[in-house]
Amino acid sequence: MKQKIVMSLLLLGFAIGGAAQNALPDTLLFVFKLHGQTRKYEMTFTPKNDALVLNWRILRNLKWQKGSYALTPQAVEKGTVLSFLMPEDGRHITLPEHETAYVLSQQAYRSLKARQRFDYNHTEYILLDSDERVADFALLHVRDTLEGGEMWILDNPALPLVWSMQNNPLEINWRVEINK
């Protein structure tokens, strides 16, 4: 009987350990490349009553600057525009109902999964591959059909995070890193 209990505890420990590897950490590091400069923002995404709150912070001149973006329930469900609003210290901004920040809306994510394409910012994106993985999630690699901008989107229906943006015509590129 003792042997069965010990074996059960070991198996439970392995299962919990494996599940922990699949989870994203609470805080993600966004590394932005903008006009030759690099900026690193720590960001957390917190669901709140069908909405989503993104808290950000950055260490500048030995002082933490911070703020937030709130995505309305309508934006989380049906947003069609990715906001590129620059963070400003102390500002807590609720984005318009058609805008999201660093995530796709549920409608766009469902379209990407079902049709291998979606529209955002009045631009069509098509799925190229899903070869890369992070935290045991696939990254859905898409490219816009007009100017060649690319995104890698976390294949996670709970948080379809834009993990990386490259070749952005606005020259606002980023990649998420997981702090170890």
Put a short name on every predicted segment.
Residues 4, 18, 164:
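Functionally constrained cores in energy, signaling, and assembly domains
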Residues 21-86, 92-180:
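Acidic, serine/threonine-rich low-complexity disordered tracts
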Residues 1-7:
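Bacterial N-terminal signal peptides that target proteins for export
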Residues 11-19:
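Hydrophobic h-region of N-terminal signal peptides that target proteins for export
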Residues 8-11, 94:
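Acidic/proline-rich low-complexity IDRs
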